[in-house]
Structure formats: C-alpha cells, structure tokens
A protein has these predicted regions:
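N-terminal amphipathic/basic-hydrophobic helices that include classical n-h-c signal peptides
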Residues: 1-12
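Long, contiguous binding/interaction regions
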Residues: 7, 17-55, 69-102, 106-150, ...
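Short, conserved beta-strand segments within well-ordered enzyme catalytic domains
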Residues: 58-60
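Short, glycine-/Ser/Thr-/acidic-enriched flexible segments
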Residues: 66
Length: 197
C-alpha cells in the first residue's frame, strides 16, 4: 500500500477534480477520526493526512466540490470543538500544490512578499487569494512544520503586483483572526534570495 501520494499523483488528482478542502485538528486522535469520517461521508481522495507541529493534525483532500464540502462540513459538525481551521476551495490556483511541496520553479525574482498565519488553513486560502489577485509567483507555502503550528507563504513579482497580492492575502487571513504578520520587500538582496530559493 502506498502511504504517501507523489507530487505527480497529487497534481493529476487535482486536474481531475479541481476542488480541495482542509481540516486542521487540535489533536492527532481527532485528526485521524476526521480523516476516516471524511472518507466515509463522500467520494474524496486524501492528499495529506498527517501530524504537524505542535501535535496538530492536517487533512487535505480533493474531489468534486459537493463531495469535498460535504466531507469538511461533516468533520466540522462531528468535532467542532477540536477543529482549528478549515476551508473548501472550488477552484484552487494551480500554483498552490507546487508551493506546498517545494516544487515551484522560480525564474525572474523581483519583489518579495511574505504572509504569516496562525494556522495552515488560513495560509492556503490566503495564498490562493494572493495568486488570483495579481501576476505573482508563489515560491513557498510552509505548513506548520517546525514553527509551533504557524504557517507562511512567500511570493514574488513586480512591486505593485506583490503589494496587491499581499494586501488581499492579509484581508483573507484577517477574516478569521489568523493573520500574524506580513511584509513586502521591494528589492531583496541577492544573498537573501540565495537562502530562500
């Protein structure tokens, strides 16, 4: 049995189904229960189901929009007290998964935008909104590993595009009170880029 889906398999599943959803649980036990419940609720495919810092659990799935929504709603209803974040995106931006899995090919780097959130769900939704707002490239979307449960996104593009994208991401992440911090660096030093890329 294959434990983890390869990046290629994840991208293929996304092309077939389009919608993605996530539930971020307070505990590992609840997370595993939610993953089982979500699979039994509707025809969805689990892309990620794993513990993250600090002892939380992420479930990321794909499928038809109605199936993903039904699965997320069922998990939220059954375990409302232990759900820290969730979302359903009907048409996620194509750059989301390469950014999550460190497979983004970044060509021309210009301005740098950073958004940091208190949970993973907010970071993904903010990244999706940013990428759809202006012509920017998502560089990385780091989810809750080694950062006490926080997450962040990095993106690049022209200063105006990065500024607009970061402002949109801030607005989206603030809706649930999950925005921690953000910045736009108009012209990052090349040595900084060397450490990021």
């Amino acid at each position: 049995m294959e434990r983890k889906l390869s990046l290629r398999r994840r991208q293929k599943l996304l092309k077939m189904s389009k919608a993605i959803g996530m539930v971020e649980c307070q505990t590992i036990s609840t997370g595993i229960q939610c993953a089982d419940l979500m699979l039994k609720t509707a025809e969805v495919e689990i892309l990620e189901s794993q513990p993250v810092c600090p002892g939380k659990y992420l479930i990321l799935m794909t499928g038809d929009l109605s199936a993903v929504k039904a699965s997320v709603d069922e998990a939220k209803t059954a375990h409302s007290q232990k759900i820290m974040g969730s979302f359903v995106l009907g048409n996620p931006h194509e750059s989301i998964f390469p950014a999550i899995y460190g497979a983004t090919e970044v060509g021309d780097v210009k301005a740098l935008g950073v958004v940091e959130t208190f949970n993973s769900a907010a970071a993904i939704v903010a990244a999706d909104a940013a990428a759809k707002t202006s012509l920017v490239s998502l560089i990385e979307l780091r989810l809750a590993r080694g950062m006490c449960g926080k997450s962040y996104l990095l993106l690049t593009g022209d200063v105006a595009a990065v500024t607009a994208a970061i402002e949109r991401a801030e607005t989206v992440a603030s809706e649930d009170g999950m925005l921690l911090d953000s910045s736009v660096i108009p012209n990052p030093d090349k040595r900084l880029w060397d450490t990021i890329l």
